[in-house]
């Protein structure tokens, strides 16, 4: 009996070795035909973290879980009209440029305001802009930019405005059932692999429509078919809530609106988190406002009555004065921002220390130059 078991084990081992050898040969052939990394064991990539780029909003970075938009993925931003969708996307453009990247904006709606984009921090001289004549042209331009591997972020505004060529050439009133959905489905199939390979972030802004005859459930839907919903790694629902009134002479005027950004789909972190931000008219998301609120909740900024203080030093009476103080002191803003990110696990402690050390060295070098009588150019 023991001999029989031993023989069976030897046969199993022999077949196992043969199968392993056959697998190794197959992997070598695949690598030869399709390049290194075409097939790999999942464990080889298990240690790799998802690469992200900040959204330009601290609250949204926290809600996204990973610390920003994942690179090499498709993002969909949708919501009602004038809810702040383009503003959220433009903050991503500004952030990409801030990190030294190249951004492109496919303006299918032909409605981009350069002055507003510049106010949000976008370098309009460096921004690549396309205003396509048809949906196919817009998606083809996006595809060529992504394939180049030189662009870090592509924004398409909006999916609803990507009109198929056949619809443009036809008459108003002609029926074109499913034409846009088929166009988007084909585009997603072509673009998804290239987006992942080049680590480009592709943001698609979308509008809302209502399904006719829906009695129960949510009647809202987004145009362009189901393909974008499936291919998107992150979907953001942007909704304006209440108006923000001004102070003093502007107390009767609306100077902005409180906005909720809900992460309705997230493939890289837990979904359904909500970011609450203030979008100020002509300025975009109030970064100082969200920092004061979040840091106060974490007790990084201490609040006593109407006064806000940091490390025992008062920074303002009332949130508006605290926001103004942080805006005037960018180094302090960055320091508090880093501490908040460490608290939420978006930044390693070592990264924070190293970033602070670099800032400290720069300050020390500047002080040394001044002591030595060296002139500092503006």
Curated annotation (Swiss-Prot):
Example of a GO biological process term: DNA recombination
Keyword Nucleotide-binding on entry: yes
Subcellular location: Cytoplasm
GO cellular component: cytosol
Residues the entry annotates as binding ATP: 79-86
One matching Pfam family: RecA_C
InterPro entries: AAA+_ATPase (IPR003593), DNA_recomb/repair_RecA (IPR013765), DNA_recomb/repair_RecA_CS (IPR020584), P-loop_NTPase (IPR027417), RecA-like_C (IPR049261), RecA-like_N (IPR049428), RecA_ATP-bd (IPR020588), RecA_C_sf (IPR023400)
Database matches in Gene3D superfamilies: P-loop containing nucleotide triphosphate hydrolases
Molecular function, one GO term: damaged DNA binding
Main location: cytoplasm
Keyword DNA damage: yes
Keywords, ordered alphabetically: ATP-binding, Cytoplasm, DNA damage, DNA recombination, DNA repair, DNA-binding, Nucleotide-binding, SOS response
Record-stated family: Belongs to the RecA family.
Biological function: Can catalyze the hydrolysis of ATP in the presence of single-stranded DNA, the ATP-dependent uptake of single-stranded DNA by duplex DNA, and the ATP-dependent hybridization of homologous single-stranded DNAs. It interacts with LexA causing its activation and leading to its autocatalytic cleavage.
Protein name according to UniProt: Protein RecA
Upper taxonomic lineage: Bacteria, Bacillati, Bacillota, Bacilli, Lactobacillales
């Amino acid at each position: 009996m023991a001999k029989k078991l031993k023989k069976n084990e030897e046969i199993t081992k022999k077949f196992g070795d043969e199968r392993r050898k056959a697998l190794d040969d197959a992997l070598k052939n695949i690598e030869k035909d399709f390049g290194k990394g075409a097939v790999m064991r999942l464990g080889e990539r298990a240690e790799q973290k998802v690469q992200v780029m900040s959204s330009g909003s601290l609250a949204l970075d926290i809600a996204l879980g990973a610390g920003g938009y994942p690179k090499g993925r498709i993002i969909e931003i949708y919501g009602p009209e004038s809810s702040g969708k383009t503003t959220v996307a433009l903050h991503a453009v500004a952030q990409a440029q801030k990190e030294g990247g190249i951004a492109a904006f496919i303006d299918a709606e032909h409605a981009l305001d350069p002055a507003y984009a510049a106010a949000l921090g976008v370098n309009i001289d460096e921004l690549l802009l396309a205003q396509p004549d048809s949906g196919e042209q817009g998606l083809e331009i996006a595809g060529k930019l992504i394939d180049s591997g030189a662009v870090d972020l592509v924004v398409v505004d909006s999916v609803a405005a990507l009109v198929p060529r056949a619809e443009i050439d036809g008459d108003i009133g002609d029926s074109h059932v499913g034409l846009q959905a088929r166009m988007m489905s084909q585009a997603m199939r072509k673009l998804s692999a290239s987006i992942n390979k080049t680590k480009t972030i592709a943001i698609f802004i979308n509008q809302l429509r209502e399904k006719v005859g829906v009695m129960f459930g949510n009647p809202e839907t987004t145009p362009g078919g189901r393909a974008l919903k499936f291919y998107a790694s992150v979907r953001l629902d942007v909704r304006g809530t209440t108006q923000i009134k001004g102070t003093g002479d502007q107390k009767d005027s609306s100077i902005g609106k409180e906005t909720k950004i809900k992460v309705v789909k997230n493939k890289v972190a837990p979904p359904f988190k909500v970011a609450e931000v203030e979008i100020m008219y002509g300025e975009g998301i109030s970064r100082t406002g969200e920092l004061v609120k979040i840091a106060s909740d974490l007790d990084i900024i201490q609040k006593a009555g109407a006064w806000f203080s940091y490390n025992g030093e008062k920074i303002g009476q009332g949130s508006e004065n605290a926001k103004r103080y942080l805006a005037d002191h960018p180094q302090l803003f960055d320091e508090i921002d880093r501490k908040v990110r460490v608290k939420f696990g978006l930044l390693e402690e070592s990264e924070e220390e190293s970033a602070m050390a670099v800032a400290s060295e720069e300050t020390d070098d500047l002080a040394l130059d001044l002591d030595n009588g060296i002139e500092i150019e503006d």
